[in-house]
From Swiss-Prot:
Protein name: S-adenosylmethionine:tRNA ribosyltransferase-isomerase
Entry function: Transfers and isomerizes the ribose moiety from AdoMet to the 7-aminomethyl group of 7-deazaguanine (preQ1-tRNA) to give epoxyqueuosine (oQ-tRNA).
Subunit structure: Monomer.
Record family assignment: Belongs to the QueA family.
GO cellular component assignments: cytoplasm
Catalysed reaction, written as an equation: 7-aminomethyl-7-carbaguanosine(34) in tRNA + S-adenosyl-L-methionine = epoxyqueuosine(34) in tRNA + adenine + L-methionine + 2 H(+)
InterPro entries: QueA, QueA_dom1, QueA_dom2, QueA_sf
Keyword tags: Cytoplasm, Queuosine biosynthesis, S-adenosyl-L-methionine, Transferase
UniProt lineage: Bacteria, Pseudomonadati, Pseudomonadota, Alphaproteobacteria, Hyphomicrobiales
Locations listed in the record: Cytoplasm
Top-rank taxon, per record: Bacteria
Amino acid sequence: MRVDLFDFDLPEENIALRPANPRDSARLLVVDPNENRMEDHRVFDLPSFLRPGDALVFNDTRVIPAQLEGVRLREGAPETAVSATLHMRADQSRWKAFARPGKRIKEGDRIRFGYDRDTVNSSSGACGLAHLEATVEEKGEEGEITLLFDISGPVLDEAIASVGHIPLPPYIAAKRPEDQQDQTDYQTIYAREKGAVAAPTAGLHFTPDLFEALDSAGIERHFVTLHVGAGTFLPVKSDDTDDHKMHFEIGYVSQETADRLNAVKARGGRIVCVGTTSLRLIESAATEDGTIHPWSDATGIFITPGYRFRAVDMLMTNFHLPKSTLFMLVSAFCGLETMRDAYRHAIETGYRFYSYGDSSLLFRKN
């Protein structure tokens, strides 16, 4: 399909720079293409749209401080400021990352992280800061590099935590710097498995009170893990969806969770994914007959209109970028024209977009 079919105009004022407070007071646009229904609600109304025996599927990944600032070290060349956003762990000492500016980096370069951009040319340098060094082992397309760190395992994790920053989405980072409030705001309350570069943002709306209301309504809660990579922020540069290449992300669905979700389906309950990351993982783990299997692997699933959904019945998700793979996904779920109408309504009525914005509850188109 032509990528420009998924384009729309989004005013700057619709982009959220901070989340709603409390989290579950965010707006919720309910869209059911099968009944031609579009209604404005709040996230705390979610239980009223679910039935006893339905199951919510959450992504319990935890955002790590994957934004690293440093300097390139090359013999015979001056130190040059660079940054790297880690996006997928390759092994205990290697990470794939997106480097900026990519043209300043080549294979074999050394990078010392722990330097702030502002200290590169200062006389005091980065004295007193923790340091972390790596070799650029491989350079790929779109600024992607493979970093081989000098340390590995938990020691490497601790070093990244020491020198790294939370990698806010570009459309927020362009407006303001990351601050202490983001340390809390950009994590779900149930985040536990470290490894994401971006938050599974639909989950940011949940509160203990909302969990209690869902429990009282007889709604099951299940957790899977997909470590969201920085590729989620990359624009689609091709003119046709067939030419776009997705970046892979590591995910896990346990045998116990797969069994419980299959039992929900067998009883007539619905699988309700909280976020596109949960949906992409469940659809990766499901076979054509809708059976969900355990999963421990990378997925690069790219869902566009025409895709036949295997297991997921409903989706809660925030509002996405024009021409993004995620807007393509929701268009596959509900129909392109339905989602164009929904986004037009959202923009006209002041819904807040993107990671810190409002949310939607989508029913899969029959």
